[in-house]
Structures are given as C-alpha cells and as structure tokens.
Amino acid sequence: MSSTILTQFGPFIESISGIIDQSNDIFEEAAKAFSAFTRSDVYKALDEIPFHDHATVHIPPTIYSKPSHDSYYYVDALNRVRRRTYQGDDDVYVPNCSIVELLEPHETLTSYGRLSSAIEARAKEGDPQARIATTYARISESQARQIKAPLEKFVLALLVAESGDALYDPILQKYDDVADLTHNCPLWCFREICRHVSGPLPDRAPYLYLSAGVFWLMSPRMTSAIPPLLSDLVNLAILQQTAGLDPSLVKMGVQVCLQAAASASYAWYVLKTKSVFPQNTLHSMYETLEGGFCPNLAWLEPRSDYKFMYMGATPLSGKYARTAPSNETRARQLGEKYGLSTIIGDLRQRTRQFTKHDFASVRYIRDAMACTSGIFLVRTPTETVLQEYTQSPEIKVPIPQKDWTGPIGEIRVLKDTTSSIARYLYRTWYLAAARMASQPRTWDPLFQAIMRSQYVTARGGSGAALRESLYAINVSLPDFKGLPVKAATKIFQAAQLANLPFSHTSVAILADTSMGLRNQVQRRPRSIMPLNVPQQQVSAPHTLTADYINYHMNLSTTSGSAVIEKVIPLGVYASSPPNQSINIDISACDASITWDFFLSVIMAAIHEGVASSSIGKPFMGVPASIVNDESVVGVRAARPISGMQNMVQHLSKLYKRGFSYRVNDSFSPGNDFTHMTTTFPSGSTATSTEHTANNSTMMETFLNVWGPEHTNDPDVLRLMRSLTIQRNYVCQGDDGLMIIDGTTAGKVSSETIQKMLELISAYGEEFGWKYDIAYDGTAEYLKLYFIFGCRIPNLSRHPIVGKERANSSAEEPWPAILDQVMGIFFNGVHDGLQWQRWIRYCSSLCCAFSRQRTMIGEEVRYLQYPMWSFVYWGLPPVKLFGSDPWIFSWYMPTGDLGMYSWISLIRPLMTRWMVANGYVSERCSSIFGNADYRRCFNDIRLYQGYYMARLPRNPKKSGRAAPRETREQFTQALSDYLMQNPELKSRVLRGRSEWEKYGAGIIHNPPSLFDVPHKWYQGAQEAATATREELSDMDDTLLRSRRHTYSSFSKLLEAYLRVRWRMCEAREPSVDLRLPLCAGIDPLNSDPFLKMVSVGPMLQSTRKYFAQTLFMAKTVSGLDVNAIDSALLRLRTLGADKKALTAQLLMVGLQESEADALAGKIMLQDVNTVQLARVVNLAVPDTWMSLDFDSMFKHHVNLLPKDGRHLNTDIPPRMGWLRAILRFLGAGVAMTATGVAVNVYLEDIDGGGRSLGQRFMTWMRQEGRSA
C-alpha cells in the first residue's frame, strides 16, 4: 500500500520493517516529518487508501442528526441539574445530542468552537436553561477528553507503520498473513464519518483535543457521540493490524459502535451491550467437544502460598464438554432489545463450529472479546453520587433488637443466645481481633508508625472540611504560610494535626468528606471518598483485624491492577478440567456493608475482642478513655477502655451516622450539595481488606452452617462438605472464585452445582447481599479470563488511545506522555499481540511523540529524544549495525540490563560496522576491539539517547525556595507526627550513634526514619503544579544532555560489558507444545510462543515470590523496602561488621533485639538471586513476570564455561554475591535473543572475577554520595 503523502517516511518505514538498518538520523528525520504533518494531511493520506468493498459497512444516517439536549435534563426540587432517564434508572450518561448551537467560534481556528461564554456567564448567575446547557457541554467535552493525545497522531503512526511491506518472520521463515489497511473496516469508517461531519468545511478533524480543552467542528452534523465513536474506531483499527484480529469479527465490533452512536446515549448503550462478545463466545464455547489439550496443574500445599506444579497435559474429550446451563435465551433477548440480533446470531453460529480446544479456538475468543468498546465511561459527579450512594440493602432477616445487649458507649454486643447467622460473623471478627491484639508486634512503636504513615501521601483527603470542623470548636491550625507545597494533600494535613491532642482531632472524624472520581472502561464510573487523617487513623483496628482474617483464616489474594501482579496460575488451575470454577461477585458491595447488619456486629466484635490485650494502653496516638456501660439493663457503670477500643467507639459513631459526602460538581454550575450516605467509603484503608474478610466469612458460614441446614439433597451436602474457604474459595474485595477440585471420578454434576448456587443466592438475600454468580465453564477472577487453562487477554480493557481523565485539570506536559506511550507498548506485550507488528507500530508511535517544540528563554527550540532513549526504556530495535532483522525480542529488559543485553548479542557486528565506517582507534579496547566506539556513539547519538533517557520526564518542583523557619516548622511537625512515640525516636538515635562507630563511610546516606519528614515535604512539593520556569529548567537540562559529548556509559553498564556469554543448546520445552496457555501466544506469534514453551509459565504468585526476597516486608511510607534491602546487602557485600547492619536496622525503627537477630541472619543466610542482585539495582523486568524466570536463573544460566574453568571466569570465594549479578546478565542476553531461550554459559570476564567484583564494590561505596 503506497501513499504519495507518506513518501517522506520511506527510509523510516523500511528501517522499522527490517529492510534496512535503523539509525538515529533516519529516526529524527521521520520525527521532523511527523511533527510537520498537519491534521488535514492525515485525512489526505487516508483518502489515498483504496479500501476493499468488504471493508465497508452501512453507517446509520441517524448518527449525524440528533435532537437538542434540552429534553434530556431538568432542574430538580433541590435546584440540581439532573439527567432525565428515559431508558432505565441508570440512563444518566451523556446523551447523544447536537452541540453546534451552544458553540462560539475560536478566534483563529474559525471552523471550531467551544461553549459560548455568554451561556457560561448566564449559568453562573443561576439561569436554569444555561445551567443545563453548560452541564451538557462540559460533560460532553469530558467524554471527548478521555484520550491520551489527538487521535490523528495514533492514526498517522498506523499509516506509517502499515505502509511497509508484509513482515518476514525469520523464526517461522515466512511472511505474516495479516491483511493490509485496505481491509481495515474501522479505519474506513473513521475516514467516512470525518468526511461526512466536515462536509464542505476546509478542516476535516471533527474535534480538536488541545491542552486548552476540546474544540468542536462547527458542523450541524457534529454530535456528542462522535468523539467516543472515533476513539473506539481508532482502537479497533490499530488492534486489527497489530493483534491480527479477524476482520469479520472487527466488522461486528464496528457495527455495535455505530449502533451506540445511533442510540440515545453512547456510553449507556456500550454499558448495556458490553457482554455481547464474551457472552456469545467465551461463555458459550464447546457445547460439543471433540479434542484438544489443557494443562494439568497441581496446587501445592499450603494453598495460601499459591505455588503450582506442572504435571503435563490432559487430553480433552466429549466428557469435558460444556455442561453449564445455556445462555442462549438471555443472549437473544439482549439482541432483540438493542438491535443486535443478526450479530448475536452470527457469533453463536461461529462459536458452535469450534469443537476442538486449540490455538485457533482461543484466538477466536480473544479476537471477539477485543471488539468490545474500550472508552472510559463518564457521567456527571451528581449522577454518579445519586446512583451509587443512594442504594440501601434489603435485609430479609434482620438481627432482632432483643439479641443485642444495652449500649456500651457507641456499640452494643451481640448476645450468645442469638440465632441470627450474624453470630458467626461476630465470632470470626472477635477471634481475629483478640489474636491481633495479643501479638506483641501490634504494639511495637514501629508497627504503629507504619500504620499511622500509610495514609500520609500526596493525595487529597477532604482537608477543607477537616479544617472547618476544627475551626468550629475554636482550634486553630498552623497554616505554614509561604511554603511551596500543595495544601490539598494528607502530608499537609498530618503536619497541621501533628501536635494536637486526640480530644481535638477526634472532632474531625465526623467531618464531611470531599469527592474524588474514577472513570473506568466497561464499568460504571465510581466516586471515591477520600477520608481525612483522623478518619483513617480510627479505621486502623478495622483494617488490622481484617488483615488478620485474610492472612490467617482464609484464602485471599492481594494484588495490584496490573496483569503481572495477579495470580495467573490460579485461573489456569481453576479452569482446567476436571476442576470446575464458579465466579461469585457481590453486586454493589460498598452499599451492602452497612451498620444495620455488618458494621454493628463487626465493631462490637473488635471492641470486645481487643479488650483483654489492650487494657489501659494508648494505640497510634489515641489515648485510653472511659465510656458509659449500660450493657446490663438497668445498671449504668463507667467502663475504662483502651486506645484501640476508643478508636472503635469513634469509628462506630461514624459508621452508625453514615458519611456526609460533599459534592461540588464542576461540570454542573450550581450543583453543590451535601449527601448523607450509609455506603461504605471507598477511600478508607479498610475498604478492600474489610470486604475480603466479610466475603470469606459469610461464605464459610454458608458452607458449614446455613447451606447444610437448608437442603437435604445428599449430593449437594457432599459437595458443600468438600469445600472450605481455606482451600476452595479465593476472594479479594467483592470478587470471589469458588474452585471445585476434580476428583478421580471426574467432574461434579452440573445439576448439583446449580442447586448449591440457588442456595447461595437465597442465603445472600437474608443479610442484604446480591450474589452475582456466573457458572459457565470458564474462570474469571479480578478481570482475568480463563477457559480450559488458557488465559484470554481482554484487549479492549487496555485501550491504546484512551486515558482516564476524571477531573478537568490540564494534561501533563511533554515528555511525561512518553511514559504513557511506553505503557501502551508493555500492555501489548502482556496481552500477547503479534510481536513484530506490535514492535513496528510502537516504533512508529514513539517516533511520532519523540519531538517537541518548546520555548527556552525567548527562542523557539525543538527537543528531540534520540531513538536510543526508547531502546533504553525497553522498545527493542529491529535491525542495527548490519545485523539480521528481528533478532531482538520484546522480552529485552529496560535500562542498563537491556542495553547490555542487546549490545552483547551483536558486539562483534558493532565493532565490524564501526571499523568499516571509519571509526578506528589506535588503542584496542577489551569491549569493542580496535573500533573508536566513543566517537561513534557520540556521532550516532547513542550516548546522548542513553543519558537523556535517564533524566526525569517531569519537572522538578522540590527545589523551590521556602522561608527557612516555616520549612523547619513543617518538617518538625511531620517528624513529631511520625515519631509520636519517644521509644521509636530513641531507637533511631541509638542506631545513628552505632552507625557513626561501625558503619560510617562504608555506604553513604543509609535509609533512616529521620529522612522521612523531608521526603514527605518533597512529596507535598512535587504534588504542586509546575511553574513555567520549572518546565523550562527541565527542557534546558534535556537540551544540555543532548548537546553534551560523553566518554562512557554509566559505571555499572561499563562493568557489565566486561562479561561475555556463549549461547549454546536450546533447552527442552517446559510445557507441551500443543497447550494453549494464553490466547494469541501461539505458533503464529513465534517469539512469545517459543519463550513461553522454553522458559515455561510462572507457576506461583509473583507477589508472594517477591515478598520472600525482602528482609523487611514493610516500612513507613516515604522509605522504600527495596532501598533498605539493598543497603543491608551492600553492607554485607562490603564486609561491614554485623553491628553496622544492626545500626542500619535500628535507624529504620526496629527494636534492638530484633535488629540484632535479623542482622545475624542476613550475615549468614543464603540469599536468593533476585534479592542479591539488588545490590547493583538489578530487578526482574515486568515483561518476564508471566514466565518462570526463577528456574531460568537457577538452571539455564551456567557460570561454569562450556569448555571448563578459566582463570578469568573464576569467582573469588568472598565474592559469591557476584553470581547473582552474572545470572541476571546471562538471563538478559538469553531473553533478548528472539526464539527459544537457549542455555547460556559464561565465556569470559575481562580482567577476571575479582577485578569485576572490585568495580561493583567501588560503585556501592560511592552510590548515594550525590543523593
């Protein structure tokens, strides 16, 4: 596909397609062309594509003619602008309406306009019609802003990447067969819609996304649905090319998006129809099954460690066909309701054709699921609050009043005689609270400081309402005038409250909470309730008790939101027959945990549970107190309570009253109100852990008590007896997965499971929970999907162009967007897109974003990152220095390890290329022979790209001048907050004096709790908005770095380059080659597939794995456990006295006996490779997390040369730690080469092992001097 407009990109296109060598000159020429390309040029290039007829689709004309917004809004009795609901209670999203009548033209871009200032002015004065118009215009603009950058940039990068020839795969030795852009239906659609909207106007872009906001094309055909529609079309267009999606499925996805734009509300339609693709593919597969293989995993004991073992492959046969009830009726009804009957019919027919579980069938499911809309859904904050925070659960069997004792302060205790199922909830929480409070660790000053510090962050926390509540009782707070920090942070709050007694700060526990918003993909937007510091403080007993339950009493997982942090093998195990899984979710979980049932029982259980262990003790700065005890009717006594119980009393008062939610809706002028709600706050430290503990406790009560009491079916009873929450029910928050282990007899019958599920639903209704249960032969947990042991990446949940922009703050200044661009690349790696196409597209995208116009002083400059910066950040090159194309894998690490790895693969080629191009040196270097590599690397800007990539991409704000006295007051206040317990301070002082004796001079700036107040202060500074000067300083630093001439890489990378490897035999496959383990990672996607089968999949929880590689699992916020760990390891490596390690541990707050014992253990213990490598900042790359990197380090990197020992490769006896570093270097080289990960053998260490070790030791001693 050739285009006359794109000819200037010719050499760049050839270089990213592997035809010619990549070079920085070609890259920068292309970057200039990208930045010179106007929006109209992009549309002209689209005009040149001769699309095939089958890439076209009927575009409903109704998407261009939409009614006015007037009839969709009204002002309610409380004077709030509200959305009229026509299609259902939740029809409160942006209506698809015309917008041109509300716009005034832009001064210079006359074809574009934004909301008329006259309307905004009338809205401020309270005019109802103007308020309605402003609300509609602003929320439509917000919907259009949910993108990372203008869509044209992503389209242009696609046009450039796809202008190259078909890609040749050197591993499969064939050209790939993904159809070119002439078959791309979403791209055709994008072009036609833009063409139609712009009509006769000279400008073609339907809207402009600029830093000043969104500007709409002044066209009568422009509607609020066009931006989200275009955003979805661009996502689909890119995915079709880079993931090799089936064009006929993508066309169905396009039709659904067009229907959404033709409907009354795009986001609402998307939300209602998001199940179309998964329901008719993933959840309907294999009604007939005639073959295939699934993995056979064993879950090792204890199950809570989440370790699995691969036992081979299980052949699949008809007996494992889908037996779960059919969803056909539901699917057909959905199709009829939303006009999608044809699509659903076609999908179901195609799904039935797959009767074998293999690479093709799982790729089909993945392709179909990728076609779901991937926009971030928005609605006004007013509607979000009134949707999410007005539900109250219907409790069918409430706890009878007579089952409670009289009040003890704010709580009542549940009597032993109660017959309510609440007694089991009470018992679990009581037991956990008693055990938690009896642990000495709970009372340790460091542990309390960690708890007090965990919510001291640069995020907001309803500070204004807190200050108002304290002013109301005449408590004045220091205002730290003139301090250049962001006041709306919990760091600032902690400093203000540090020296106030609890009797004052406790007033703020009942203060209003402010409002945060989160927009999500394929889920309703959520409002966040950021609690203030005193509210978080009294939540601690709730958090600690829930943590105890989750750690000791159930099978919960903790994970972040990234795919790599979740326990993937759990889903593989759960979905592999004969095991079966049931996905159990609690609908509206926050709203279902209220004082009426849960919180009243839990608060009483904690209050009574901690009583015996906490007598008279304060906790986390909350003193002991006295309450009225009227638990025995007619008797009133004063009862002393401990600090922990005092917290529970205050928390109970808050939970009982509910939260007062202050809504200030920036999208709707005049929508400013306070809303009382009993819904559990989503911003509490207790939220997730609390829900998890309740989720498992209620399930345990069902399996052991309620279930058996409500059925006499012997099969159901036998099934319930075989299940426990310690072995079969995994949960996190409101998400649960019930795993029914396969027996020697095979699967449990579908009817038996159905009967149990009906019981669970009925059980939940008793206490107000609505269990949302899916039993369909697949496993879904934490938004990961599995079928027959194969993960199905949901590509639509990682939108390429979309970005959550929940508030109206301006977008982040360049070059911060480069982190997002690299994030797009890594998402694609985790999701298993077609590796060559994805690298090519991302190379094009990175080039498009690599250049920026800026003002430095009075002159215009262009800032340009060389291509090497992107290589340093992890984007693998395609072809360099005369190498073959496509020899670098996307598993190449980032940073120094990645640079070392690719250079190691082609070092002889680089030397030859440099010499051939005239870079010859008089002196021979051990690394590049007789090549004058320093001159070469400066000429090709390799050094400059390397050093620019290491510079910060956000302006530095912590250097601002501040009045010295105020700054010292502020850091002193933070220090008082942290060191509230004098014992903690004396430990750190003791550590410091010991350090002077035994540690001084060994390493610089050892981590200490005394650093934390200053780090918090810096954090509060960094949260502020950057000034123009700070932006200019950052640009200036980048420019200077680009102009500088360098003589070497960093000391670490120079040391790494002394090590050479020999790549040898391929290893045996770790898994059966016929097993689909991740849809899309299959023989058609050569490199990821060969890595997966040669290295093997990760078979344990990565989080648990890394937790075991730390000496200290937790520390106060502001210190980093990895930094403490590497300081301790460096001390050990540098031969420090054990007393220096003890001093270091005292400085981070451990008590002396504990510090001494841990120091002794560190001195003697055999330390894991991953942990030891931290001494030189090496860490496992994210892209390896789904692979078994641990066994690769242990078994496939050989430190004994293939032909026997050499003097140069021997490692001195006292430098055993070098082995860990060498294993990382070897693994980096093996993973960076495409194809099977081979066994690597150490070949040579230039200068020998001792000299290398000494280089690292010198580096360790110097590290931290500059900090």
Curated annotation (Swiss-Prot):
Ranges for domain RdRp catalytic: 555-792
Disulphides: none
GO function term, MF aspect, one: RNA binding
GO BP field: viral genome replication
Enzyme Commission code: 2.7.7.48
Known role: RNA-directed RNA polymerase that is involved in transcription and genome replication. Following infection, it catalyzes the synthesis of fully conservative plus strands. After core assembly, which consists in recruitment of one capped plus-strand for each genomic segments and polymerase complexes, the polymerase switches mode and catalyzes the synthesis of complementary minus-strands.
Name of the protein this chain belongs to: RNA-directed RNA polymerase lambda-3
Source organism per UniProt: Reovirus type 2 (strain D5/Jones)
Species lineage: Viruses, Riboviria, Orthornavirae, Duplornaviricota, Resentoviricetes
